[in-house]
């Protein structure tokens, strides 16, 4: 949230004509609106901006993937986690296309899109030539949260889980007081829900990253610490 004014300023200097929609809980949006108004005046942000309140269970269609929003508990804030999911796709099976005499070209595109085609001597249904679903990916991002209770339904079998790990387990009482998780809790949650990879964020400056990583990796080996400009392929 605190980085939004800087982002807006940069985009304004570039004289972008694109607008931006800020999604968030009511409390979060109120903070953003007041920050922007304090810097540039009410309704005078350097780029066009809209504000879209989030609700639990809301699904945003982003074209190639969907974003599912779910509530998480972090003190008295209206915080959310997010499931980014791309659909599994069914690919054409070349040997079936050849066996049924489907030529290269637009007809194969019709079948790939799930529509039957008519040849000179037969009708070919997509089910005749499509393979099983494959390739869908699931990324779950959870920021500040004081508990993972009730979140397994969103996280189970994710290819990647990005989640906070503010404290070490030796400071679990402090984590409870401030509404955060320990590295061990984050790792145990990942292991229980059979995620593919765990990426940790929001570590307290009182620890070295290596300490956080060691505690988590002891429970869930496929763990890494998030860093600016990371690129990770799911």
Residue map of PLM features:
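Arginine/glycine-rich "motif VI" loop of SF2 helicases in the C-terminal RecA-like domain
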Residues: 11-17, 40-45
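Active-site-proximal loop/helix segment associated with metal-binding centers of metalloenzymes
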Residues: 65-141, 145-154, 160-162
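Hydrophobic packing residues within well-ordered alpha-helices of enzyme cores
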Residues: 4-7, 32-36, 151, 212, ...
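A glycine-rich helix N-cap at a beta->alpha junction
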Residues: 38-54
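Histidine-centered divalent metal-coordination motifs
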Residues: 1, 74, 202
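Binuclear metal-ion centers of metallo-dependent hydrolases, dominated by the metallo-beta-lactamase
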Residues: 50, 56-57, 148-234
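Di-metal (Zn2+ and/or Mg2+/Mn2+) metal-binding site signature of metallo-dependent hydrolases
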Residues: 1-13
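Short internal beta-strands
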Residues: 19-27, 162, 199-201
């Amino acid at each position: 949230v605190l980085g939004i004014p800087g982002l807006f300023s940069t985009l304004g200097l570039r004289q972008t004509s694109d607008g931006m929609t800020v999604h968030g809980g009511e409390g979060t949006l109120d903070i953003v609106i007041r920050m922007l108004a304090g810097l540039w005046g009410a309704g005078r942000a350097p780029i066009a901006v809209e504000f879209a309140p989030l609700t639990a269970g809301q699904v945003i269609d982003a074209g190639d993937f969907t974003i599912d929003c779910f509530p998480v508990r972090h003190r008295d804030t209206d915080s959310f986690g997010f499931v980014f999911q791309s659909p599994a796709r069914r690919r054409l099976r070349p040997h079936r296309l050849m066996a049924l005499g489907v030529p290269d070209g637009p007809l194969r595109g019709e079948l790939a899109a799930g529509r039957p085609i008519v040849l000179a001597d037969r009708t070919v249904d997509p089910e005749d030539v499509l393979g099983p679903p494959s390739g869908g990916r699931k990324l779950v991002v959870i920021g500040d949260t004081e508990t993972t209770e009730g979140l397994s339904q969103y996280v189970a079998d994710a290819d990647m889980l990005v989640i906070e790990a503010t404290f070490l387990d030796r400071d679990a009482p402090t984590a409870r007081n401030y509404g955060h998780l320990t590295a061990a809790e984050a790792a145990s949650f990942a292991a229980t829900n059979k995620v593919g990879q765990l990426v940790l964020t929001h570590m307290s400056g009182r620890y070295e990253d290596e300490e956080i990583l060691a505690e988590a990796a002891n429970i869930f080996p496929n763990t890494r610490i998030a860093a600016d400009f990371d690129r990770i392929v799911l």
